[in-house]
């Protein structure tokens, strides 16, 4: 999984593009490998001075990679800002998304 993602990213940047689009770069990866891929994308974006667009539902990736973040729902841009203001938004749909994708990871099922 992780090696295939790295190879895909390497192939995408081989021609030194101005733009890189990553569609769900962490899908199917374990949490540790996801962090490595996020850092790789972030580092390469800076090193090659390219604009990177990442389509993801992974809150950790959003906060790790995103300098500027856009929240799109049903084809409409509902919010845009940076990682420092994402939790201060008035956009209820975005707040619901953040809660669902953050709090759910911290719940341990029991009897």
Outline where the language-model segments fall.
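A short, proline-enriched helix->beta-strand linker immediately N-terminal to the Walker B motif
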Residues: 14-18
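Catalytic Walker B motif of ABC-type/P-loop ATPase nucleotide-binding domains
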Residues: 20-23
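Helix N-cap at the start of a conserved alpha-helix in ABC-type nucleotide-binding domains
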Residues: 31-33
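H-loop/switch region of ABC-family ATPase nucleotide-binding domains
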Residues: 56-57
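C-terminal boundary and immediately downstream tail of ABC-type ATPase nucleotide-binding domains
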Residues: 87-111
